[in-house]
Amino acid sequence: MHKRPLSILLRPLGLLYGLIAEIRNTLFETALLTPWRPPCPVVSIGNITAGGTGKTPMVDWTTKYFLSLGCRVAIISRGYGRLTKGVQMVSDGRHLLLSAREAGDETAMLAANNPEAIVVAAEKRKEGARFIQKTFENFPPDVIILDDAFQHRQMARDLDIVIVSASEPFFKARMLPEGRLREPLRNLARADIILLGKITDPDEADAIEHALTATGRPVLRTRVHTLGLEPVTDCSEESANTGVQLQALAFAGIAAPEEFLASLRRTGTDVRAHRFFRDHQPYTTETVRSLIREAKEKGLSLVTTEKDWFRLLGDPQLKELMEHAGCSYLKIETRLPEGEEKLRMALRDLVGR
């Protein structure tokens, strides 16, 4: 009853948002605005909606593949939720230089999981790329990966990958702020490859894939593969890997927490209680103590996402509290059940490997 009047109020803002997006895109398409091109190939991984579609795991997959080819890789991410501003070096490809508080949880996680990659946080991806070009002038990267950059057209890219979630009816979605669309759906035709992820209903996924083929772009399906629970300390390993069904209090501050719970249950974890927070929301000592107290009272083990664990790692006190509590986090990765070789070939062609 309350949602419809609010939707009506927000609709004019959505129309204005869409108009501004279209004007901006037209300026680039008519060459009135020219994107800056760095000296190395660029891959952009983004989406057309606000919220989680699985961009970060896909950036991780792409980075690992380029590294396996022997490439020197640089990642540029906005660094959502960080306390710093401007261009920040998160990793120089040898050392992790910033915590999640300074770099953003996703950016810090990408850097820690890919220690050989250069990782930079920058709201303006072009400024981040110029910083990399200047800093690593004598040993430049072979390829730059832009995280969440489909709408960041100031920087040219050689391969535009867009991820679409099959778990939300985005074809019926409206523009921000009424809905979750960042720009009109017809702009998916600007992508080079469309990845369809978060598939729960195969029939619905077939219908979405059929609709996406109208863009004339290849559509490949992805899935989240659950690797299992990782204890945050060696002393919590026994509780996480005894083979006995884990009874858990799950907590997360991500865009799609229900999918986290579903992935947890696929590991055999018995989720008895859960607590959700806003995406990228900083944890406080009070919140963490409350979670630990509730888990202890109910006789449950604390389980969270890897992204949330990196956010907690950024604060030494919160890290210590969770280590003593025997917390574990869920480790996941992106896989492409079909079409993986097609994507690999596109990436290899880009770097001439």
UniProtKB/Swiss-Prot annotation:
The EC number of this protein is: 2.7.1.130
GO terms under cellular component:
plasma membrane
From the UniProt record, give the pathway where this protein acts: Glycolipid biosynthesis; lipid IV(A) biosynthesis; lipid IV(A) from (3R)-3-hydroxytetradecanoyl-[acyl-carrier-protein] and UDP-N-acetyl-alpha-D-glucosamine: step 6/6
Residues that, per the record, bind ATP: T49, A50, G51, G52, T53, G54, K55, T56
Domain of life of the organism in this record? Bacteria
Task: Select a single GO molecular function from the record's annotations and give it.
Answer: tetraacyldisaccharide 4'-kinase activity
Keywords per UniProt = ATP-binding, Kinase, Lipid A biosynthesis, Lipid biosynthesis, Lipid metabolism, Nucleotide-binding, Transferase
Its UniProt entry gives the catalysed reaction(s) as: a lipid A disaccharide + ATP = a lipid IVA + ADP + H(+)
Write down the top EC class of this protein: transferase
Q: Which GO terms describe its biological process?
A: lipid A biosynthetic process; lipopolysaccharide core region biosynthetic process
Q: Give the family per the record.
A: Belongs to the LpxK family.
What this protein is reported to do is described as: Transfers the gamma-phosphate of ATP to the 4'-position of a tetraacyldisaccharide 1-phosphate intermediate (termed DS-1-P) to form tetraacyldisaccharide 1,4'-bis-phosphate (lipid IVA).
Name of this protein = Tetraacyldisaccharide 4'-kinase
Species: Chlorobium phaeovibrioides (strain DSM 265 / 1930) (Prosthecochloris vibrioformis (strain DSM 265))
